[in-house]
Amino acid sequence: MKTSTDRILTTHTGSLPRPKPLIDIVLGREKSGALDAGVFEVATAKAVEDIVAQQAAAGIDVVNDGEMSKPSYTTYIRHRVSGIAPDPRAAEQGRDIMVGRDLLAFPDFGVRGQRSNFAATPFPGCVGELAYQDRSALDRDIAHLKAAAAKAKPAEVFMTAPSPGILTRFIINLHYPSEETYVAALAEVMKIEYRAIVEAGFVLQIDAPDLGSARNNQYRHLSDDEFRSKIAERNIAALNAAIEGLPADRMRLHICWGNYEGPHTHDLPLLKIIDIAFKARVQAFSIEAANPRHDHEWEDLKTIKIPDDKILIPGVIDSTTNFVEHPRLVAQRILRYAEVIDRERLIAGVDCGFGTAVRTEPTVADSIVWAKLAALSEGTAIASKTLWGS
C-alpha cells in the first residue's frame, strides 16, 4: 500500500454516482431478475472507465471502480454465492434490523429515515448452504478496473468487498443454526473474493459497518460491553480467518456508523471499538471523521497508542450533505490528524460512499460529489504544504 511519503495521498470510500442507463439496468435486474448480459457488460465497462478517469481528474490518488456493477455494497453477493434468495421472512426481519435507536428516539425524524439508503431494499435471505459458485462477475469487475486504471494511471487502485459481519445484517440468516456458524460460513465464502482482489494487484477494502452502525440497529438490544465482547470480537475473528495468508499491507478496513443524514445520537464512540478493530490483520483503517457526531474524535485518538504498523484514513469530507467543504476546512481536518499519527501514515478520505444503493435516490447530487472530491484534493494540497513545507 502506498503511503504519504512527500505529500498526503487522497482516496475515498467506494461508491460513486452511477450513470442513469446503468442504474436502470442494475435496478431492473434487482426487480425482475432479468439481465441482458451483453448490454450490462458494455455499460459497466464504459462506466468504470469513465468513473476512474473522473477520479483522476478530481485529484484522487487511490481510486476504485465506484462500485458501478453493484446494486449495493453488500447485497450484490447474492448473484455470486449460492444459498441466497429472496424470502418474505428475510424482508420482514430486515426491516426490523434497520430500525436504529436514534430513529426511535426521534420518531418524527424516523419517517424521513425510511428514505435512507436501504429503506427500499428487499433483504434476501440465506436459505441454504453458502458456496461461492460464480466468479465470472468478480472477474469482470477486476478486468474492467484493470483496463480503466491502465488508461488513467492512478497512484494506486482499491476494490471493496463486505465483511462477514456486515453480511449478517443484509443477508438474513434463515438456514444456519446460529449466528456464529453463519458468520463463519460467510467468512469461508468471502475469502475467495478477498484473495482474488489482492491477487489482482488491488488494495482490498473491507467494508465493516458491523463494527459501528450495527450497534445502533442490529444489536440495539445489547449493551456496549455486550456488543464489544459478543459481536465485535467475533466478527473480527471471522474476518481474520477469511483474510488469513493475505499481506496486511494490501488491505484496509472501513468502519462507519451508517451512511445517512440523521441524529446519530446513539452511535458507539470510536474509542469503544477502535481497540478491537486494530486486531484486524490489515494495515489501514478508514473512519468517519467529518460528520458532526464524529468530527471531535481526533482528540480521543490522541489519548491512545496507535500501533506503529497502522495507517489512518480519516474522512475529511462528509458524504451525507450537499455542503461542499472549503479546502481550508479540509486542510484543518487533515492537520488535526497529523497530531494523532505520523504524516506518512495518514491518507485523506471521505466518510462513506456517495452511491450506497441503487434503489435509493442519492443524498448528494452527482455534480456536488465531484466538487467535494475536488475540495478534498485542494485541501490536501494545502495541508501537505504545511506538513512538508514545500
Where are these regions (language model features)?
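Domain-level signal for soluble alpha/beta catalytic cores
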Residues: 1-390
